[in-house]
Design a protein with these regions (language model features):
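Metal-dependent amide/peptide-bond hydrolase catalytic core
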Residues: 203-287
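Histidine/acidic-residue-rich, glycine-tolerant segments that coordinate divalent metal ions
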Residues: 75, 83-93, 99-100, 115-228, ...
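Short, small-residue-enriched loops and turns at beta-alpha junctions
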Residues: 19-24, 75, 131, 232-235, ...
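Active-site beta-loop-alpha junctions enriched in small/polar residues
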Residues: 21, 71-73, 128, 156, ...
């Protein structure tokens, strides 16, 4: 990459960082990237609604169809203060580096457009990576266009700048969101005996999940509590509903199934002891 394109790519990354948008709302991000690629390359651009791809057609009669993918969405987190390109979107930032992914793919679009390639290339700008929705939708392009190879990368700290790291086998864990919903009966705070408070059963379940992670599944699985919701700052009322959200991770899906079974079985028992109803939901399932 020449110096001029490198400097432009860095500016693109900064602008993407500044206009960060959450999953499913990557409107400005998508428009910005489509406009840039239309101005700076000769690639064909196909708008697919929530996402888009740019296409380079090779003159090689033996060309394969390959895909190179980047994700566009930011995270619902406040940005780091003190940088000149800080996100202008309240509560949203590119703390996972997707601004860099898109900027790099933009730079690659420019290079392939100028220098050509021996294969047909689909440059895929994916929405909704953090929620999983975008990956499922964009994956349909693989069969639709008979794509033979798909490539992507992720920035990773701790390695020397400019290093490309490859690994045989699994690189990222499978992941699954487990939502535990408990329903009891609300009551006035002065008469807790009239109600059924889910707080205690949820607390026991959360502690059990941590115990499983640290003992039975140590090194094989993670059970990270990412959310707890039970009542609020209403000191005259005891809650009748509550939930806990736990992210399960492992390199083996069978291990995720096992730890999920252990947690849900414990939650059922804890809920029964407190006179509660309990249900479970899965979200953000990544095989």
């Amino acid at each position: 990459m020449d110096r001029q394109l490198l400097e432009k790519t860095i500016k693109v990354r900064h602008e993407l960082h500044r206009i960060a948008e959450v999953s499913g709302r990557e409107v400005k991000t998508k428009e910005y990237l489509m406009k840039l690629i239309a101005e700076d390359t000769k690639l064909q651009i196909c708008d697919r609604g929530s996402w888009f791809y740019a296409f380079y057609e090779s003159d090689n009669p033996n060309a394969r169809n390959i895909g190179i993918r980047a994700d566009m969405d930011g995270l619902p987190m406040e940005d780091i203060e003190g940088i000149e390109y800080t996100s202008v979107t309240p509560g949203v930032s590119h703390r996972c580096g997707h601004d860099g992914h898109c900027a790099v793919l933009y730079g690659l679009c420019c290079r392939v457009s100028r220098e050509g390639a021996g294969d047909n290339v689909y440059f895929i700008f994916q929405h909704g990576e953090e929620t999983g929705i975008g990956g499922a939708e964009c994956a349909e392009l693989i069969e639709e266009k008979n794509i033979n190879r798909m490539y992507a990368f992720h920035n990773w700290s701790g390695f020397e700048e400019g290093t490309v790291m490859l690994k045989a086998g699994t690189v990222m864990c499978a992941s699954r969101g487990l939502r535990i919903l408990m329903k009891g009966r609300p009551s006035h705070a002065s008469r807790p005996e009239d109600g059924a408070n889910p707080a205690f059963a949820l607390a026991k379940t959360i502690e059990h999940a941590r115990m499983l992670e640290e003992t039975r599944y140590r090194g094989d699985a993670m059970a990270t509590v990412v959310g707890i919701n039970c009542g609020g700052a209403n000191f005259g009322m005891m809650p009748g509903r509550g939930e806990a959200d736990i992210t399960l991770r492992s390199v083996e899906e069978s291990v995720i199934e096992s730890i999920e079974t252990d947690i849900t079985a414990f939650a059922r028992k804890a809920a029964e002891e407190e006179g509660l109803e309990v249900t479970f939901e899965r979200e953000d399932v990544f095989p």
